[in-house]
């Protein structure tokens, strides 16, 4: 299979499947053959990213992700996507291990957020983004690393609210339990109170909440990073977005 999209997945498995579903739903196709070819590594046993970043585990996930990226390149993929924000702590190593492009979910999300702000019903310049993500993503500062060159300040929830986000990700979504609208809106409102111009679902598990609670229909200032990556993937594949 040539010119396929390589999906470096399994981080986590549910987000990977949801990401593929998003791409299919977003692509303007009237028959099977008009959809995007994808080769997927749903490598669920990759060591925990957050545990390694926080120093709670000595088992690095980097080698496994580099190996998967190289496997996708060898299989003929034209570019690679990684539907996991936390894994982008290792982005440069993964990118440098292959000769094909690797889309960066964080860069794509920040760029989209800036453009989306100017297209709102009441246009707003995006200067501050609230990041809802794993402890690993927050502590590693990956959003701030990519946000600073774009002129965007990226801020995390206060510690008590970060614990609530951690609970949603690990004890509810990954464990197969639903998250209530009240719970996620409490955190979103907290970020609005910190002066954020937009709130980023910066963990692909949180994308499940975004979908299930239809936050995109009611919260113009909430942006799902997985949705942005899926959109960018469709466009980079040379396909049109479905209206």
Where are these predicted regions, by residue range?
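Non-catalytic structural scaffold of enzyme domains
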Residues: 1-243
């Amino acid at each position: 299979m040539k010119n396929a999209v390589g999906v470096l997945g399994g981080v986590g498995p549910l987000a990977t499947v949801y990401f593929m579903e998003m791409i299919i739903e977003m692509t303007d196709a009237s028959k099977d053959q008009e959809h995007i070819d994808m080769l997927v590594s749903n490598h669920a046993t990759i060591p925990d990213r957050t545990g390694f970043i926080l120093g709670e585990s000595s088992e690095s996930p980097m080698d496994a992700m580099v190996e998967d990226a190289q496997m996708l390149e060898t299989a003929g993929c034209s570019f690679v996507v990684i539907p996991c924000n936390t894994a982008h702590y290792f982005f440069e190593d993964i990118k440098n291990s292959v000769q094909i492009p690797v889309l960066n979910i964080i860069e794509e999300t920040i760029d989209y957020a800036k453009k989306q702000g100017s297209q709102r019903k009441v246009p707003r310049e995006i200067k501050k983004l609230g990041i809802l993500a794993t402890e690993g993503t927050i502590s590693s500062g990956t959003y701030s690393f990519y946000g600073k060159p774009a002129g965007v300040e990226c801020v995390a929830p206060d510690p008590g609210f970060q614990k609530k986000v951690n609970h949603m990700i690990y004890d509810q979504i990954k464990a197969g339990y639903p998250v209530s609208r009240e719970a996620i809106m409490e955190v979103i409102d907290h970020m609005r109170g910190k002066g954020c111009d937009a709130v980023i679902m910066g963990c692909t598990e949180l994308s499940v909440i975004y979908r299930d609670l239809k936050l995109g229909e009611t919260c113009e200032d909430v942006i799902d990073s997985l949705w942005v990556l899926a959109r960018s993937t469709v466009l980079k594949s040379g396909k049109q977005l479905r209206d």
